[in-house]
Amino acid sequence: MYLDINWEEDSIPENERGSLTGLLEQGIAKAVHLSAESEEAEVSLTLVDDARIHELNRDYRGVDRPTDVLSFALQEERSDEPDILDYEDHLLGDIIISVERARAQAIDYGHSFERELVYLAVHGTLHLLGYDHMEEADKEKMRRQEEAVMSQIGLLR
C-alpha cells in the first residue's frame, strides 16, 4: 500500500501530521484489503480548504458548492466490469478532502476530527474501488464496508 499525502491545507500542525498519516494509511489500506482483497494499491490524498474543494467540485462535477470529499478514479468502471472493481493495475486514483468540512462534520456528528478525516478517506477509497451510493441498496453496501473498516481500525462512532 502506497499513500501519497499532499498537505495543501495548513491548519494541521506539523507535529500532528505523523499520527494522522498513520491513521489515514490504516484506513485506506484496510478499505482496499476488505473491498478488493488486495494489499497493493497506490492512492494520492490531498487535504485542502473549502475554497479549493469548491473550485474542484464546480469544475469537475458542475456542483457550485464545497463538499467534504471528492474521488477521481484512474480507471473508470465499464459496463462489462463487475460492480466492485478488481484492478490488475494498483493505481487507484486521487482523493481530495476538505479539512474545514471534516472539522465541521466532526462537531456536528459528535466525534473526533481524526475519526471524521479517516472516515472521509475510507469513503473516498471505496469510491475509487467502484462503490457508489446513488441507489439505496448500493448505499447500504457502502455504509457496511465503511463501518467494517472503521471498526477494524478502532475508530468507532
Curated annotation (Swiss-Prot):
Enzyme class: hydrolase
Compartment(s) where it occurs, according to its Swiss-Prot or TrEMBL record: Cytoplasm
EC numbers on record: 3.1.-.-
GO molecular function, one term: metalloendopeptidase activity
Cofactor note: Binds 1 zinc ion.
Residues involved in Zn(2+) binding: 123, 127, 133
Keyword vocabulary terms for this entry: Cytoplasm, Endonuclease, Hydrolase, Metal-binding, Nuclease, Ribosome biogenesis, rRNA processing, Zinc
Pfam families: YbeY
GO biological process, one term: rRNA processing
Cofactors demanded by this protein: Zn(2+)
PANTHER family tied to this protein: ENDORIBONUCLEASE YBEY, CHLOROPLASTIC (PTHR46986:SF1)
Homology family: Belongs to the endoribonuclease YbeY family.
Biological role: Single strand-specific metallo-endoribonuclease involved in late-stage 70S ribosome quality control and in maturation of the 3' terminus of the 16S rRNA.
Protein name: Endoribonuclease YbeY
Species per Swiss-Prot/TrEMBL record: Desulfitobacterium hafniense (strain Y51)
